[in-house]
Amino acid sequence: EILIGLVGSEMCIRDRFKDNTGGKNADYIPYLANIDKNLFGISICLLDGRTITLGDSSYCFGIESVSKVHTAILALRQYGAEKVLKMIGADATGLPFNSIMAILLENDHPSTPLVNAGAITACSMVQPLGKSDKKWEAIVSNITDLCGSAPQLIDELYKSETATNFNNRSIAWLLKNYNRIYDDPDMSLDLYTRQCSLGITAEQLSIAAATIANDGVNPVTKKLIFDASLSPKITSLVATVGFYERTGDWLYTSGIPAKTGVGGGVMGIMPGHFGISAFAPPLDSSGNSVKAQLAIKYIMNKLGLSIFGSTRFTITG
């Protein structure tokens, strides 16, 4: 039996890593380059709805690629697992998250909704087709359901992203060339850019992760958000490519499927136990938060947990 109070020790976790100077803010998006590099927050949401929050867990940061998990869930809710597999796919590319080469090498499908090409395709699939405002409402409503509270669009980040997303424009139209996008490419790209520009907190992301870990039931609102049969599909997508080309190393050392974003957030799913999120802007060379990785790995190792193991424990306190 491991007491949750041990996991929640700020001295033991946050203070252990807060002075780490590794990594640097994403500098190709001006808004992200200017975020305070010393921000650092951690949140754990248990399946009974209790949350443990440390440091800057209520700071609103850009969700960026962590939003791909949420839109993948929306696609699964609207189309079902079989159609999503056929229309997008579930394979890791082994290449960077924004790779155009991955599309050229496997032009029969975008590979997975958790890389840029697949995420833009997922946005194109959002119903109702052809109606940008309604599609956006569906995207925001889905994220609100998962997090238990609404995200807020960061206008400055959206403008910054829109002004610099040349690579994603190429991806959208290349998908169109291969008939792997299902609505207007420019509309789909704008929806994707907007969803990446949503402001979110570590606490909100931990609740979303706990909803996945809890078979689709939000542990805070107690509402059923999606069918329990989808939870293993979502977790498998995250386990396969959540850290892009570094996913294998991450799973090997942490034992928890997690999705990362260049805004500095990491969201981890421990099925049947909890959701966890950590946030710190400085990134490693693969675009993953240095301190968030350290904190989550530390917690998982302290608990002796792995999604691939048979360890059982009880959370008390």
Range-by-range predicted roles:
Residues 58-60:
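A short acidic/small-residue loop/turn micro-motif
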Residues 9, 13, 20-22, 75-195:
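Active-site-adjacent helix/loop patches that line small-molecule binding or acyl-intermediate pockets
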Residues 214-317:
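Structured C-terminal helix/loop/strand segments within mature extracytoplasmic catalytic/sensor domains
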Residues 1-8:
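Single conserved hydrophobic/aromatic residue that forms the stacking wall/gate
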Residues 32-35, 111-112, 163, 255-259, ...:
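Short Gly/Pro-enriched turn/cap motifs at secondary-structure boundaries
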Residues 162-165, 173-233, 284-289:
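Penicillin-binding protein/beta-lactamase superfamily catalytic region
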Residues 48-49, 62-85, 208, 276:
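Active-site SXXK
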Residues 18-54, 267-268:
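A short, well-structured edge-of-sheet supersecondary motif
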